[in-house]
């Protein structure tokens, strides 16, 4: 069993106030920030310091560009900005989707067949949009 790591330090981002950690990933952490103008909650994905060199940084930049191109789809989060923090780590500011994720909902409640079909259609539509843009997931 692998020990869970601590979250990286959230970067200082002008016009944004750190709120809390949302999740930890293999090459990036995601934080909740409060944006000053316009006032709204945003999710900020930050590349880990250990991933600053080589392929991970290129993949991160590609992800930001691809997500921005796909943001017009209602089931794909909107990218607001992508920058480099003062500490040298790239970050992506994106729409924050509050509420439980699908995995958490599945563990806590029974999802009806009708709801599962609606979710499947929305997911399929998002994947189709990505495929039409040349993205394979």
What are these regions (language model features)?
Residues 19-25, 30:
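Protein kinase glycine-rich loop
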Residues 34-41:
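Conserved N-lobe loop of protein kinases adjacent to the ATP-binding glycine-rich P-loop
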Residues 87-101, 105:
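Conserved short submotifs of the Hanks-type protein kinase catalytic core
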Residues 119-120:
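Activation segment signature within eukaryotic-like protein kinase domains
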């Amino acid at each position: 069993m692998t020990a869970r790591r601590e979250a990286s330090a959230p970067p200082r981002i002008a016009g944004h106030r750190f709120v809390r950690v949302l999740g930890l990933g293999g090459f990036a952490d995601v934080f909740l920030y409060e944006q000053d103008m316009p006032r709204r909650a945003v999710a900020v994905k930050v590349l880990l310091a250990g991933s600053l060199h080589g392929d991970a940084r290129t993949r991160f930049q590609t992800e930001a560009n691809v997500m921005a191109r796909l943001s017009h789809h209602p089931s794909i989060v909107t990218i607001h900005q992508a920058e480099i923090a003062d500490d040298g780590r790239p970050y992506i500011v994106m729409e924050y989707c509050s509420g439980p994720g699908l995995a958490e909902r599945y563990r806590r409640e029974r999802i009806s067949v009708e709801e599962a079909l609606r979710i499947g259609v929305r997911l399929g539509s998002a994947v189709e949009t990505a495929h039409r843009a040349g993205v394979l997931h």
